[in-house]
Amino acid sequence: MWRPSENQVYVPPPAPVSKVITTDAYVKRTNIVYHASSSRLLAVGNPYFAIRPANKTLVPKVSGFQYRVFKVVLPDPNKFALPDTSIYDPTTQRLVWACIGLEVGRGQPLGVGISGHPLLNKLDDVENSASYAASPGQDNRVNVAMDYKQTQLCLVGCAPPLGEHWGKGKPCNNGSVNSGDCPPLELITSVIEDGDMVDTGFGAMNFAELQPNKSDVPLDICTATCKYPDYLQMAADPYGDRLFFYLRKEQMFARHFFNRAGTVGEDIPQDLVFKGATKSTVPNAIYFNTPSGSLVSSETQLFNKPFWLQRAQGHNNGICWGNQLFVTVVDTTRSTNMTICAATTQSPSTTYNSTEYKQYMRHVEEFDLQFMFQLCSITLTAEVMAYLHTMNPGILEQWNFGLSPPPNGTLEDKYRYVQSQAITCQKPPPEKAKQDPYAKLSFWEVDLREKFSSELDQYPLGRKFLLQTGVQARSSVRVGRKRPASAATSSSSKPKRSRKK
């Protein structure tokens, strides 16, 4: 007798109800292009820590190993003074901006910035160790400086970028973590904000939680969280708003090799080593290296050159929803830390005395952002509006559109005398003002609402765009053209001699 299989049958998942489509399917591009640029953007601060006497920031932390996340605010194209008003119908269409090109300008010379810790947890030099050191004492920390991993990054999208790092996780219900045990690790994804530290070569992790001794890494990251861009998560975004495209260059090599002082939490298994007659105790094997980014050169620069967006890697092909754009920049090739000294007396002695001078450290950043934006129109059909509402309801709200709720079949109470004291208060609550969804996040805001110009030939990036597209800029001044001959001159010319047959 035949019997059906008792194995579990797996049914394939159903097809998705709605399919994510590219913006090119419902966005129509026009031939109107604008140039916009920021002013010179400068930042000055201490490269290692912020100066906060009495919980008030006097000097911010500005390091060459921080993310610079620019929130670029664009004007509303539907309220824009357009040269041609016939390009769209305001009753059935809406206008949006599309980013088609940008150039991130960087000032300041190339340089290598160093960091360190005056009390770094470094025990032995395990790279060139001639003999074992004496038994470690209670405090073997030393003063060590190093240069970091070299990173250049430019990431563009219309939503904030995402970063990943390792933090302390929660143990399972059946498990427990005692004092001194290694905590469970958890991969955490969060928004990259302006001022967050990049991966310097010691890993993307929360050092405040996972290294509470504050001595295993340099000063600028020992209580911070180093984040690495979550490229996998942003690439998997169905709508592609967080990542139009990115440029990346990373390099590093291990410069020195040390080990840590402290009690080893996990001993080396006995089957991995043979103990010697004079070495019955296995030495410390908690190794680490100091990173180095090596040479910085102008031949490998990603900045101060234009980049054109023809096709984004996701479904959003450069459309700036919400009239905003996020540009994330990392450039460690200009991380020079300047040392500044100030005399403590009005007339210092002619003989050098180091106590008469105070030493300070500062780091400076210089940026210039230039963009090319193309005007686009969207025809508001029922299908397009439903799709936009599913993708981001805030888009239609910004265009003053709302969806009517379905009819309610329940019986509602309606009082006649609404202001009467005989009934409960019927005054509707005031509507809350729409808040910025990124209000609690820290970004470097760049306002371009009054920086748009259609005179492309008046700006460096605009001229590069005209040269790239082969479009000649119109000019009202004619240069190098000959004046046409007048009628009198042409009539006084000699007639041609006729050929005789």
Curated annotation (Swiss-Prot):
Q: Where does the protein end up?
A: Virion; Host nucleus
- Enumerate the InterPro entries for this protein: Capsid_L1_Papillomavir, Capsid_L1_sf_Papillomavir, dsDNA_vir_gr_I_capsid
Which residue ranges are recorded for the region named Disordered? Answer: 476-501
GO term, biological process aspect, one: endocytosis involved in viral entry into host cell
Does the UniProt entry include the keyword Disulfide bond? yes
GO cellular component terms listed in the entry, alphabetical order: host cell nucleus; T=7 icosahedral viral capsid
One Pfam match, given by its short name, reads Late_protein_L1
> Is Ribosomal protein set as a keyword in this record?
no
Which controlled-vocabulary keywords does the entry list? Capsid protein, Disulfide bond, Host nucleus, Host-virus interaction, Late protein, T=7 icosahedral capsid protein, Viral attachment to host cell, Viral penetration into host cytoplasm, Virion, Virus endocytosis by host, Virus entry into host cell
Provide a Gene Ontology MF annotation, just one.
Answer: structural molecule activity
Main subcellular localisation: virion
Q: What family is this protein classified in?
A: Belongs to the papillomaviridae L1 protein family.
What this chain does, per the entry, is described as: Forms an icosahedral capsid with a T=7 symmetry and a 50 nm diameter. The capsid is composed of 72 pentamers linked to each other by disulfide bonds and associated with L2 proteins. Binds to heparan sulfate proteoglycans on cell surface of basal layer keratinocytes to provide initial virion attachment. This binding mediates a conformational change in the virus capsid that facilitates efficient infection. The virion enters the host cell via endocytosis. During virus trafficking, L1 protein dissociates from the viral DNA and the genomic DNA is released to the host nucleus.
- Partners and quaternary state? Self-assembles into homopentamers. The capsid has an icosahedral symmetry and consists of 72 capsomers, with each capsomer being a pentamer of L1. Interacts with the minor capsid protein L2; this interaction is necessary for viral genome encapsidation. Interacts with protein E2; this interaction enhances E2-dependent replication and transcription activation.
Q: What is this protein called?
A: Major capsid protein L1
Species this chain originates from: Human papillomavirus type 55
